Amino acid sequence: MFGKGGMGNLMKQAQQMQDKMAKVQEEIARMEVTGEAGAGLVKVTMTGSHSVRKVDIDASLLEDDKEMLEDLIAAACNDAARRVEENQKEKMAEVTGGMQLPPGMKMPF
């Protein structure tokens, strides 16, 4: 099934991919993205591990109703989470060479 040294090469490639994957996972965890809502009136900065680092609220919103502000904060958090997911997909595609994963399967495994 495998030619001479084929299995060894396959194992070496798998180890290299695993090493690259670990590096990318560390890079993703350190990255930060900013999600926005209300045309930038609310901004949420989130890490690649989905931890919220900062919430920035324009002062003009503090005079408005509480419910609208809560909605904008939630929308900004969701936007930041979406951006984290997009960045993760891009970084993982670099490692996997664009190989598509089966639906529902997320990286890292």
Swiss-Prot record:
One Pfam family, please name it.
YbaB_DNA_bd
Q: Which InterPro entries match?
A: YbaB-like_sf, YbaB/EbfC
Assembly and binders = Homodimer.
Protein keywords: Cytoplasm, DNA-binding
UniProt subcellular location? Cytoplasm, Nucleoid
Q: What is this protein called?
A: Nucleoid-associated protein Shal_1591
Q: Which GO terms describe its molecular function?
A: DNA binding
Which residue stretches belong to region Disordered?
87-109
Q: Offer a single GO CC term for the protein.
A: cytosol
Similarity field: Belongs to the YbaB/EbfC family.
Free-text function comment from the UniProt entry? Binds to DNA and alters its conformation. May be involved in regulation of gene expression, nucleoid organization and DNA protection.
The protein's matches in NCBIfam families, at most eight in alphabetical order, are given as: DNA_YbaB_EbfC
Recorded superkingdom = Bacteria
Task: Tell me what organism the protein belongs to.
Answer: Shewanella halifaxensis (strain HAW-EB4)
